[in-house]
């Protein structure tokens, strides 16, 4: 796997993360846009559809060779101004949705529809889809004049499956440079209201949406997902700012970004196989988000990178315990979450029961500051590689890395510091499962070359079998192994 050079921030830091979080929130709208497609240094074009599953995590083809995820090209045709079709950019004007839809209908592939600065009132839904204000078309871009200058204000308010913008089976589309919000005036996180989804991208008759770029959007006052990408591939979400969910209860409420496969489908040959999506350089105010970034169902070989999350009510980056596999989670900053910064496996679910995430996910080079756990792996999630993360515990932190029933997990080269009494840099414990699923003990765990400095406590092994604890540096802390547990190598 490709190596990573960490920055030089090392040593005790027990209180500065609060100030950093405030800075992040104040500067969130200045996130630098990605210069282009993101991949590994040496890239090849995606391999044609073949047979067999992937074996290597991240942005690779079936053979394991790095790929560059294709992105839609720039506008090559006309620019259509929605005000020429009757849209009024003044706030509290008439319904502007028909004019926007008319401009999209008039556009041809290669054209773009532009929303000049102003506020556009969306009071009606598409005649062919009563769930959506606006329906995207393949090859036609939709662009505002800036996240703070162009606003789409929807009147959708709690209707089932309601979406401000929907794209089903679309390709080669850019959606950029505006804010989506709603007229919801109630409390945040405690009620329901606004649209279910800000942006919804999905398949159409089994054909995935692909080559879609969603960038520099502000999305707030939604109920379920700010951006939802379902059964699609080659979708890039970059430079967006997401906050203020109106509900954060169970059943899928209050997710910032959700990348989903199809429930009960694990078929890499399917035309709607979920893979090769990028979630990069987005910012989340997690005070009213259940999860900031969520991967769900058998979605694989996605990249979640360089995102900043300040606070979240549950696990900030969550692989949701429904077979998500071979995803790469790197270079993210997660600050002050009430639960784990990054979690693999989930005990929830009503319609779809959650337990283990899939095999071979790669969690590396993240900065995890002041969360309850830095990384949590549970409920039978197998073969996770956790390496080169920088974890700084806060007063309420319980563990830097916590591993329960997670066979084959490797912890390598992580740097862990901070914490108060009761905090352990690395902790292995029995998994009691969820409704009888996922019970077990840690097994086949490798804890190697980690650095634990000025932490309240070092490594604690309460349960498990077949461990290797090798060449770790524990500064002023300790290694505690419960009676009756054998560790094959300790040095």
Language model segments and positions:
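Extracellular beta-strand-rich solenoid/capping regions of secreted or surface-exposed proteins
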Residues: 100-109, 121-143, 151-176, 181-210, ...
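Bacterial signal peptide processing site
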Residues: 30-33
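C-terminal motif of bacterial Sec signal peptides marking the signal peptidase cleavage site
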Residues: 26-28
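Acidic Gly/Asp/Thr-rich repetitive segments characteristic of extracellular carbohydrate-active
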Residues: 82-116
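Acidic, glycine- and Ser/Thr-rich low-complexity intrinsically disordered tracts
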Residues: 47-65, 69, 75, 82, ...
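Extracellular beta-strand solenoid repeats
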Residues: 114, 121, 135, 141-143, ...
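Short glycine/acidic-rich loop motifs that flank beta-strands on beta-rich extracellular proteins
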Residues: 111, 124-125, 147, 153-163, ...
